Regions:
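N-terminal intrinsically disordered, low-complexity segments enriched in P/E/S/T
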Residues: 1-138
Length: 138
């Protein structure tokens, strides 16, 4: 959901049709697995949040909140995802070792470069872009 824009709903078929990347990483004490998924920045672009130009001004304070079915949430600053700034690789994966995700899916968020998988989100149900550029203080 992007403020001021209609919500974008992606079903498994639509996600499967988008360009995928592969990474080999492990979570916790598990053996490394091959994961396939769509870059979060591609999903954001489809929702009208383009990162193809460097972020400036208020946009630097905006963030992406990812929520799981159990209400677990993680946040990424748009600047973290911007290719000219943090360029953090974040994937919405739909397969592991060549098989569709079962209990962790249908979509799971992975951050392959993180030293521990605390920002990996199972059963993603929502991705929101929040304008953090307000000058109002609580």
């Amino acid at each position: 959901m992007v403020a001021g824009k209609p919500a974008l709903s992606l079903d498994a078929k639509t996600l499967a049709a988008m360009p995928h990347e592969e990474v080999t990483v492990s979570a916790h004490d598990e053996a490394a697995s091959q994961w396939r998924g769509v870059k979060l920045e591609d999903v954001l672009a489809r929702a009208g949040v383009s990162l193809d130009k460097p972020l400036r001004g208020r946009a630097l304070a905006s963030f992406v909140r990812v929520t799981a079915a159990d209400q677990y949430q993680v946040v990424f600053g748009l600047a973290d995802l911007d290719p000219t700034l943090g360029h953090t690789q974040v994937l919405l994966v739909d397969s592991r070792d060549g098989k569709a995700l079962d209990k962790d899916g249908p979509v799971r968020l992975l951050v392959p470069g993180d030293k521990r998988p605390a920002r990996w989100v199972r059963n993603v149900t929502a991705i929101e872009v929040v304008d953090g550029g307000t000058t109002a203080r609580p």
